[in-house]
Amino acid sequence: MINNVVLVGRMTKDAELRYTPSQVAVATFTLAVNRTFKSQNGEREADFINCVIWRQPAENLANWAKKGALIGVTGRIQTRNYENQQGQRVYVTEVVADNFQMLESRATREGGSTGSFNGGFNNNTSSSNSYSAPAQQTPNFGRDDSPFGNSNPMDISDDDLPF
């Protein structure tokens, strides 16, 4: 069976970071995720999805992702229940995030630069460090040569085309 969730959305407010009695970090947050279709009056609706993230990724999220941040989240969906103060059973469905990734720079979000930026923060939960080697000049191998650069017409008939 598969229980896999991938979301891209904006944080509706700053994450709420707490610690369990055994000092395990847990952060809760809500993502506003646009639907792919528009309503009858032409407006795009959004779903507000409750999420929870644990341990070091929770601390990273609380430190780096603020209200309005565009983030990508991977994880699983879970339903839990508890009894409230009135004795009623309450069911909660939420996404348990394994990791997240910032999808835009702070400058872009705040209206500064409009250039392309990959976010620069990939919160991979693996324990290995990922350091990149210094950039090296790669050989061109003729990539700048256009195969259509000589502008000679091609001798091909319509019968030779597969479509």
Curated annotation (Swiss-Prot):
GO cellular component terms listed in the entry, alphabetical order: nucleoid
Disulphide bridges: none
One Pfam match: SSB
Comp. bias (Polar residues): 131-140
Region ranges (Disordered): 109-163
Gene3D superfamilies: Nucleic acid-binding proteins
Domain of life: Bacteria
Biased composition (Low complexity): 119-130
UniProt keyword DNA repair present: yes
Gene Ontology MF terms: single-stranded DNA binding
UniProt keyword list: DNA damage, DNA recombination, DNA repair, DNA replication, DNA-binding
Motif Important for interaction with partner proteins boundaries: 158-163
GO biological process, one term: DNA recombination
Family annotation (InterPro entries): NA-bd_OB-fold, Primosome_PriB/ssb, ssDNA-bd
SSB domain ranges (all copies): 1-104
Task of the protein: Plays an important role in DNA replication, recombination and repair. Binds to ssDNA and to an array of partner proteins to recruit them to their sites of action during DNA metabolism.
Classification via HAMAP family: SSB
PANTHER family: SINGLE-STRANDED DNA-BINDING PROTEIN
Self-association state and partner proteins as the record states: Homotetramer.
Protein name: Single-stranded DNA-binding protein
Organism: Streptococcus pyogenes serotype M1
